[in-house]
Amino acid sequence: MSKPIQIERGVKYRDADKMALIPVRTVVTERQEILRKPEWMKIKLPADSSRIQGIKAAMRKNGLHSVCEEASCPNLAECFNHGTATFMILGAICTRRCPFCDVAHGRPLTPDANEPEKLAQTIHDMGLRYVVITSVDRDDLRDGGAQHFADCISAIRRKNPNIRIETLVPDFRGRMDRALEILTATPPDVFNHNLENVPRVYRQVRPGANYEWSLKLLENFKNAHPDIPTKSGLMVGLGETNAEIVDVMRDLRRHGVTMLTLGQYLQPSRHHLPVQRYVSPDEFDEMKAEAIAMGFTHAACGPFVRSSYHADLQAKGIEVK
């Protein structure tokens, strides 16, 4: 029997080391077939990478993180080349270990008290008018990191009074009331929390999370701020069916959510959950039509769509695929 991994504070555990800590064994094995990517999943890289390197340098200089890099997002080159990024606060080490996600797991460091001001200054220097702030899960904090979110929102608005802020929050497991008390007092312009997939596969895809809890988080925020849009996103290709995705869309509408993103899951490494199917652009179009018919005001559905992909355009209702 192999010795258990000793988790050291501040150390990032990724790939095989991270997956070894998941009690539900669902990761890919050598014998499992890896599906070949269809033509529509091929990524075109920009010819000039100077803008990309500039954003990376600004992040490093200020000790900030982007979920684009930490989660190995396939849209990194496109978004960075257009001067946009999704900032990830509260460090780059997550207390969860979801087998679809490339963000490192471990025992995180104490939050950086200067991060809100550094974030606000970086956003000002980049000249952004719309920003998405997300975070790792911080189950080690009594409020799940909610106060840090609020501090970041306040600092950003002080430095950038005309900016719009979208927050992509964790589920605040066991801390919802306290977290919402804080966030409803300092609300963003868009409140986003991803369900990720369908309830049937939650035990494998989101160990430690609860489908009903996530729906309740979205509903409770909406009840506190009926005027602020709530948003959620799902990945396809993890064993669900299109019919199950549509059922989740109905659940989201019943809980007051009006903005939706649907995108294709891509396996970050051979140690992560395998892709079980590739959904065609036509199928995404069909699901978008279903979403609009249900009453979603915004629905970004396509192979490369991610929760924060062109979030500024999503918020304006401009079609994103």
Swiss-Prot record:
Compartment(s) where it occurs, according to its Swiss-Prot or TrEMBL record: Cytoplasm
Iron among keywords:
yes
- Read off the CDD domains from this record: Radical_SAM
Residue sites binding [4Fe-4S] cluster 1 per the record? C68, C73, C79, S308
Q: Quote the InterPro entries the UniProt record gives.
A: Aldolase_TIM, Elp3/MiaA/NifB-like_rSAM, LIAS_N, Lipoyl_synth, rSAM
**What Pfam families is this protein classified in?**
LIAS_N, Radical_SAM
- Pathway linked to the protein: Protein modification; protein lipoylation via endogenous pathway; protein N(6)-(lipoyl)lysine from octanoyl-[acyl-carrier-protein]: step 2/2
Record key words, sorted: 4Fe-4S, Cytoplasm, Iron, Iron-sulfur, Metal-binding, S-adenosyl-L-methionine, Transferase
User: So what does this thing catalyse?
Assistant: [[Fe-S] cluster scaffold protein carrying a second [4Fe-4S](2+) cluster] + N(6)-octanoyl-L-lysyl-[protein] + 2 oxidized [2Fe-2S]-[ferredoxin] + 2 S-adenosyl-L-methionine + 4 H(+) = [[Fe-S] cluster scaffold protein] + N(6)-[(R)-dihydrolipoyl]-L-lysyl-[protein] + 4 Fe(3+) + 2 hydrogen sulfide + 2 5'-deoxyadenosine + 2 L-methionine + 2 reduced [2Fe-2S]-[ferredoxin]
Enzyme Commission number(s) of this protein: 2.8.1.8
What positions does the entry give for [4Fe-4S] cluster 2 binding?
C94, C98, C101
- What molecular function terms (GO) are annotated for this protein? 4 iron, 4 sulfur cluster binding; lipoate synthase activity; metal ion binding
Which chain regions cross the lipid bilayer? none
Which residues does the UniProt record annotate as the domain Radical SAM core? 80-297
State the superkingdom: Bacteria
Entry's SUPFAM superfamilies? Radical SAM enzymes (SSF102114)
Q: What cofactor does this protein call for?
A: [4Fe-4S] cluster
Matching entries from SMART domains are given as:
Elp3
Q: How is the cofactor bound?
A: Binds 2 [4Fe-4S] clusters per subunit. One cluster is coordinated with 3 cysteines and an exchangeable S-adenosyl-L-methionine.
Q: List the disulfide bonds.
A: none
Any one annotated GO CC term: cytoplasm
Q: What family is it from? A: Belongs to the radical SAM superfamily. Lipoyl synthase family.
NCBIfam families documented for this protein: lipA, PRK05481.1, PRK12928.1
Q: What is this protein called?
A: Lipoyl synthase
UniProt lists the gene as lipA
